[in-house]
Design a protein with these regions (language model features):
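Intrinsically disordered, low-complexity non-transmembrane regions of multi-pass membrane transporters
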Residues: 1-27, 210-228, 263-270, 277, ...
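N-terminal signal-anchor module of multipass membrane proteins
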Residues: 1-77, 82-95
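Membrane-embedded helical hairpins/re-entrant loop segments and their flanking transmembrane helices
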Residues: 8-23, 45-66, 242-315, 429-431
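Juxtamembrane interface elements at the cytosolic ends of transmembrane helices
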Residues: 9, 37-41, 171-181, 189, ...
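Hydrophobic, membrane-embedded alpha-helices of multi-pass small-molecule transporters
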Residues: 23-36, 162-171, 189, 221, ...
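Short, non-helical or kinked segments that cap or interrupt transmembrane helices
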Residues: 49-55, 71-83, 125-134, 186-192, ...
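Interfacial segments of multi-pass membrane proteins
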Residues: 87-92, 179, 303-318, 324-328
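Membrane-embedded alpha-helical modules
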Residues: 93-211, 320-429
Length: 432
């Protein structure tokens, strides 16, 4: 795995600093924007925030992250699901002013941890995150989302719907076909084409509210929420304590996504540009989101999945996606058009995106020749997978470690405390 910023991955169609041609650039960037759109706007819709502000926050957050990480990490920032529960609670009591302080505090926590890591270094990362830990965690990142993908693909108002599932399978089929059968631009944007195909099928079946699209105004300025301007600022320690601790949970998810990107791009981003910069980028993105009325943001697995499928890792494509997201926040009709995207379309494409992430975890262990016949490795992998995919959680008061975060912590602890060989394996060796 290279730590040299001049390294070029010839296995990628476009490596991190390669710039695509204009038409391909637009198509590839739109593909990333469409892939993250559903998840990014569902968070504010559930909480009662503005989807347009969330979209703008994701775009500006991505640009800030790319700038802070010196254009070395192709990551997209979208609305984080980890904060939904506390934000819902605060919306009922303090309204957005309390949520804003909580989101800003999340960014500050990230920046404090980034400063500590900058001071003490990150050599410890290799010790606590060997392939036997990284592989299963990456698999959990993909597989823990499988239930969500299946629900979107099959369920309508809590009941199984065959039409939905057929649309999901058609969306998946179109993406797979375009990826396998075509070269050139079409072969580079299978996810986008799958989404468009599924959308058109849904439209033909009457699942898209065309009237809402028709009556929507073309342009609309998002109702940004600025502290001291849109609402009076008053420090709320209760709101900060409610949201800020969850930053430690999302940090583990952040590190998991960086692990996936390390394997995907054959680099070590923990070393270059450094874990301190990746955390600082995430922190600044959330801090800015809180100051303009958006939810906390985090790196998105959907966009990592797109990169795996297309082998396009260009940071410029992510920059384009961020710019499109910021523009779409003001183009209300296009915003409404995408918000009308049926769930089975999202579910169908998610089968592919989340599946590719999971299989990359398997590839991590294969590449490092991890021996699962060794009891130590088997115990770590098995425990991590079931806890993570089963979404087990540890709750202490209002503080909760769920799924991926808990699995990551347990995997790290097991790796640090378990001996290299079980007693029975030592006996076998002595006999031999």
């Amino acid at each position: 795995m290279s730590q040299n910023s001049e390294f070029h991955d010839d296995n990628a169609l476009l490596d991190i600093h390669d710039r695509p041609k204009p038409l391909a650039w637009a198509g590839l960037s739109l593909q990333h924007m469409f892939s993250m759109f559903g998840s990014t706007v569902i968070v504010p819709l559930l909480v009662g925030l503005s989807p347009s502000i969330a979209l703008f926050s994701s775009g500006i957050g991505t640009l800030l992250h790319i700038m802070i990480t010196q254009r070395k990490i192709p990551a997209y920032m979208g609305s984080s699901f980890a904060f939904i529960t506390p934000m819902l609670a605060l919306m009922k009591t303090t309204g957005y002013p309390g949520i804003a302080q909580g989101v800003v505090s999340v960014g500050i926590v990230y920046l404090i941890i980034a400063a500590i890591i900058w001071a003490v270094g990150s050599n410890w990362v290799d010790k606590i995150l060997p392939p036997i830990v990284v592989g299963p965690i990456v698999m959990v990142i993909g597989l823990s989302l499988a239930g969500s993908a299946a629900t979107d693909a099959m369920m309508k108002n809590g009941h199984y719907n065959l039409t939905y599932f057929m649309i999901a399978l058609a969306t998946l089929g179109i993406a797979i076909f375009c990826n396998m059968a075509f070269k050139g631009l079409i072969g580079l944007i299978p996810v986008l084409l799958g989404i468009v195909g599924g959308y058109l099928i849904s439209m033909a079946l009457g699942l898209v509210d065309l009237h809402a699209i028709a009556v929507a105004p073309w342009f609309k300025i998002p109702a940004f929420e600025f502290p001291g301007i849109s609402y009076p600022f008053k420090l709320n320690f209760g709101a900060i304590i409610t949201i800020a601790p969850i930053a430690f949970v999302t940090m583990t998810e952040h590190m998991g996504h960086i692990m996936v990107l390390n394997e995907l791009t054959h680099r070590n981003f923990f070393k270059d540009p450094g874990l301190n910069r990746t955390l600082a980028g995430d922190g600044v993105a959330s801090l800015v989101a809180g100051l303009i009325g958006g939810p906390a943001v985090t790196s998105y697995g959907e966009n990592i999945g797109v990169m795996m499928i297309t082998k396009v890792h260009s940071v410029y494509v992510l920059i384009g996606a961020a710019v499109f997201a910021m523009i779409f926040a003001f183009v209300n009709k296009l915003n409404v058009l995408i918000m009308q995207m049926p769930l089975p379309v999202i579910g169908g494409i998610s089968f592919l995106l989340f599946g590719t992430i999971a299989t990359s975890g398997i590839q991590v262990m294969i590449d490092d020749k991890v021996d699962l016949s060794k009891k130590r490795n088997l115990m770590i992998a098995s425990t991590t997978l079931v806890i993570g995919i089963g979404n087990a959680y540890l709750q202490i008061g209002q503080f909760q470690f769920t799924g991926l975060a808990l699995a990551t912590i347990i995997a790290i602890i097991l790796n640090l405390v378990m001996p290299q060989e079980a007693a029975s394996e030592k006996v076998i060796k002595s006999v031999e």
